[in-house]
Amino acid sequence: MELEDILNAREGDKLFLLGNEATVRAAIESGVGVASTYPGTPSSEIGNVLSGIAKRAGMYFEFSVNEKVALEVAAAAAASGVRSFTFMKHVGLNVASDSFMSTAYTGVRAGMVVLTADDPSMFSSQNEQDNRHYARLACLPLLEPSDPQEVLEFMNHAFELSEDYGLPVLLRTTTRVSHMRGVVEVGSRMREPSEGFFRKDPERFVPVPATARVMHRKLVDKMKELRIRADESELNRVFNGGSDSELGVVASGGAFNYVYDALESLGLELPVLKLGFTYPFPAGLVEEFLSGLKRVLVVEEVDPIMEREVLAVAGSARLDLDVHGKLDGTLPEIYEYNEDILRKAISGLTGAPSVERECDVPDIPERPPSLCPGCPHRAVYYAVRRAADELELSGDEIIFPTDIGCYTLGIEPPYSAADYLLSMGSSIGTSCGFSAATTQRIVSFIGDSTFFHAGIPPLINAVHNKQRFVLVVLDNRTTAMTGGQPHPGLPVDGMGDEAPEISIEEIVRASGVEFVETVNPMNIKRTSETVKRALEHESVAVVISKYPCMLSSGAVRGRPMAVDGEKCDLCLECIRDLACPAMVTREGEVFIDPLKCRGCSVCLQICPAGAIKPEGKG
C-alpha cells in the first residue's frame, strides 16, 4: 500500500492494508502525537510505514534504542497530554516490562496504546510467550483484534478507553493478524496531534512506597469499573445467537478466523462468542452465553487463559457444562492454529463429517535459511574459524555465545558458531558467566543494533569483573534482520533527519576495554590475525567488524567472481567452508552464479589453488 494512501485517505475510503499498516492509519485518525518502537518481527512494518509519513502526519516518531526506552518515551508523552503509541514484538515487552508495570500505577493524561505483536509458532522469535498474561500482571485493559479492519477500529477504541480510565491499553496482535491483508474502510481524522505540557503531580507520577500504595488501590477500583465496561463492550459479539445447538464456541483474536472458516466448511451454525475486549474478562457476558449450552469449545492462541476463565465462570455459576479446549486435549496446547485443526476439533465434538482438503504439493528441495551472498558476517565466521584452527582450538575447547540478528544463522554448518542464546544482548552477559565458570575459550557475537539495545551494561560488567573473552561486534551499518531500520550508530534518525552518529568503538573504549580493533571483514587474513591476537589477550577483547549489509543502500557491488576450470583442483574448500549461496557444483565443476555474486572477493582470498578471479580477468 502506498504511504500517501494511508496518510491522505478520507472517511469511507477503502484501502487494502496489512494489519500492521492499519495501526498506522488508526494512529493518524486518533491524533497520535508521539510514536516509538524498537523494530522486531512481526511488528516491524508499523515502524517502517511511520518512518515514512510521521512528519507529514504531524507526529513525532523514533526508533528507540530498545523497547524499554520506547515505552518510556510514549509514557512521558501521554503524561504530558499527548496521545502516544508504542509497539513491539512480544519479547520486546519483556524488555519494557519494568516501566510498563509502573505505568499502570501512574496512569496517563492522554491516550496511550501499547501494541504487543505475539508470534505463535515462533516464526521469527526465540519463544512463544503469550503476552495476554501481561495485562493481568499489570492490571491493564486488553483488546484483541482479528483482522485489519478490527485493528483500525480497536485501536481507535483503545485511545478512548485509555482516556476514559487514565490507563494505558494493551493491544495484542499475532503474526497472522499483523501480516494479514484485507479491505479496511477508514474513518476520519478525529483529532490532530497537540503540543503537550507536563503538569507536575508527584503524588500521581512518583510511585515511592507511600504514593504507590494509594495508586494500587485506585488501580484496583478502576479494574472493577472496567469489568462492567468489558461486559457491555461492543467489541464482544455473538454470532449465530439463534442457533439451538448445545455446543458453543468462545474465541478471540486471530483464532476466531479459523473458527469461522471451519464452521463454514462443515456447514454448521454454532453459537460463537467472539471476544475482542478480553481483559478484564467479561464474566457476566460469558455466563449469559454459556447458560443455554451443554458444551463449549474455547479457541485461543497460545495459553489456555480464556479457557481457565470460562471454567471459573462455569464453576461460579454452577453450570452443568463441559468445557473443551487445550486443557482436555481437544485442541493443541501450543503453536498457532489453522482451519484444519479447528475443523477436526469441531467435527469430533459434533459428529459432523470432516472434509479433508486435498492438496497436491510437489516435492521441492529444502531451503534452509542462509546468509546472503556477500554478507560480511560470513567472512567473519570464516575468519574466526580459521583463527581458532590455527590456535588449535576446536570442539568443546571454544564456546560461541551468540545474539539476536541475521548472524544467529551462524548456528548453521559449516560455521557452527552459535552455542548459546537467550535474548537481546545475552551474548555478552553469558560470556561473563562462561568466563567465571569455565576455562574454555570464548568468542561471542553481537550485532551493532543489538549492541546499542542491550550490550553496553554487560560489557561494563565484564570489564569490571575482570572476565576474559573475545567479543566480535558485527557492525553492518543497519538493523538488518527486521528490514534495515536505523540505529544510533548511523547519522540518521527514525524520521530520516540528520542525527548524531554514536561510535561503537568509543563506547567500548569508554567502558574500559583495552583491546579494541576495527577490521574490514572482507580482508580475511587481517581479520583472522586480529581474532588470534584477541584470543591471546588476557582480558576482554573487542573486535569490531565494520562493513555494510549487502542489502543496504551503502553496499557496493563489485565485479562478479569466476572460477578458472583449469586451475581448480576441486578441493571444494569454497563450497565446504564458506558456503556462499552464489557458489555451487555443476557437472563436476565449481560454478559461481554471476547474478547472485556480490563481488566481495572472499572466495578469491581463500582458494588454495588461486583458481578464482574477477569475471573477465585473464
UniProtKB/Swiss-Prot annotation:
Binds 2 [4Fe-4S] clusters. In this family the first cluster has a non-standard and varying [4Fe-4S] binding motif CX(2)CX(2)CX(4-5)CP. Residues 558-587, 588-617 form the 4Fe-4S ferredoxin-type domain. Keywords: 4Fe-4S, Electron transport, Iron, Iron-sulfur, Metal-binding, Oxidoreductase, Repeat, Transport. Its EC number is 1.2.7.8. The keyword Transport applies. SUPFAM superfamilies: 4Fe-4S ferredoxins, Thiamin diphosphate-binding fold (THDP-binding), TK C-terminal domain-like. [4Fe-4S] cluster 1 binds at C568, C571, C574, C607. Heterodimer of the IorA and IorB subunits. [4Fe-4S] cluster 2 binds at C580, C597, C600, C603. Its cofactor is [4Fe-4S] cluster. Coiled coil: none annotated. It comes from the Archaea. This is Indolepyruvate oxidoreductase subunit IorA. It catalyses: indole-3-pyruvate + 2 oxidized [2Fe-2S]-[ferredoxin] + CoA = (indol-3-yl)acetyl-CoA + 2 reduced [2Fe-2S]-[ferredoxin] + CO2 + H(+). GO terms for molecular function: 4 iron, 4 sulfur cluster binding; indolepyruvate ferredoxin oxidoreductase activity; metal ion binding; thiamine pyrophosphate binding. It is an enzyme of class 1 (oxidoreductase). Pfam families: Fer4, POR_N, TPP_enzyme_C. Gene3D superfamilies: 3.30.70.20, 3.40.50.920, 3.40.50.970. GO terms for biological process: organic acid metabolic process; sulfur compound biosynthetic process. InterPro entries: 4Fe4S_Fe-S-bd, 4Fe4S_Fe_S_CS, HACL1-like, IorA, Pyrv_Fd/Flavodoxin_OxRdtase_N, THDP-binding, TPP_enzyme_TPP-bd, Transketo_C/PFOR_II. Catalyzes the ferredoxin-dependent oxidative decarboxylation of arylpyruvates. CDD domains: TPP_IOR_alpha, TPP_PYR_PFOR_IOR-alpha_like.
